[in-house]
Amino acid sequence: MGNRKKEIALQVNINTQELWEEMLGSKGLTVVDVYQGWCGPCKPMVSLFQKMRIEVGLDRLHFASAEADRLDVLEKYQGKCEPTFLFYTRGELVAVVKGANPTLLQKTILQQLEAEKKVPAEGGEWRAATDEELLGALKWPPHRKDGGEDGDIASSGKTCTLGIIKPDAVAHGKAEEIIMKIQEAGFDILLKEERTLTEAEMQAFYQHRAREEAFERLVHHMCSGPSHLLILTKTEGTEDVVTAWRTFLGPCDPNVARREHPESLRAQYGTEMPFNAVHGSRDREDANRELALLFPSFKFSDKDKEAPPGAEAQTMVGPVEDPCMSERI
């Protein structure tokens, strides 16, 4: 009974607009567990929240829970099956974590607390992120309650690419570990969706390989179980995100990757072709096509429609050797 009271005291349940506005006025950092009515708040995270609240202090860190269907402000999170945690400081949304990942949650909490502390100490200007910057250039939800048309909200200017954690890596329980490595490498996951891809989707996805003997095997593998679909961007450095992601993946053949790029994802998690754990779009054109196929509501920024600097010059010089050109997987 005592533990139950601690849980209630730890997380304030927000079920009205008034309570939501009261939360926005709180000092320090507030982490809101957005949940669906049919599953309730994410209880496995309570012990982490209790630990961090004790370590950080009651004044600087607060926790709340809110059912997505009860508040208009949470409309875009309605019907999402994975837990979503929203981070608010000074009444503004500053971070979003999707999924029950205690390591990532703890890291994000500490980062946001440190950022919040530095502003008054260094005399800097507080910059609140927008929903579009945190969740990506997405037309989400696909319709508005007032019946109006959604505009292109790709205002962040970030270029994006597609990543897929394939069924073989998911089946071996490596998905969350791979996601952590992706984030540690400086990539931002704008959207993550776990689902089993359909045969029709994969036939369209790999249509450029339809005449190859490996086509049916590849399609069957990609439809054999759940995959994690990722929309990725990169905020650090000047390298195009498509190129950066391909480099991070390593060569398509895991055996080649282990020899030439042992730190790459395919070297660490791939076994043999076609079980190379992760997919990356080959170039900007492929990224746009693949994103449009698997995320039909995705809205491209102007930068996504442009080739990265130097791409035209590279094409004029001649064909570029790409060990993945034949496989494109």
Swiss-Prot record:
Its main location: cytoplasm. Residues 11-115 form the Thioredoxin domain. One of its GO terms (molecular function) is nucleoside diphosphate kinase activity. Residues 157-303 are annotated as: NDK. Residues 303-329 are annotated as: Disordered. Gene3D superfamilies: Glutaredoxin, Nucleoside diphosphate kinase-like domain. It comes from the Eukaryota. GO terms for biological process: CTP biosynthetic process; GTP biosynthetic process; UTP biosynthetic process. It holds the Pfam family NDK. Keywords: Cell projection, Cytoplasm, Cytoskeleton. SUPFAM superfamilies: Nucleoside diphosphate kinase, NDK, Thioredoxin-like. Expressed in lung airway epithelium (at protein level). One of its GO terms (cellular component) is cytoskeleton. It is found in: Cytoplasm, Cytoskeleton, Cilium axoneme; Dynein axonemal particle. Monomer and homodimer. Belongs to the NDK family. May be a regulator of microtubule physiology. This is Thioredoxin domain-containing protein 6.
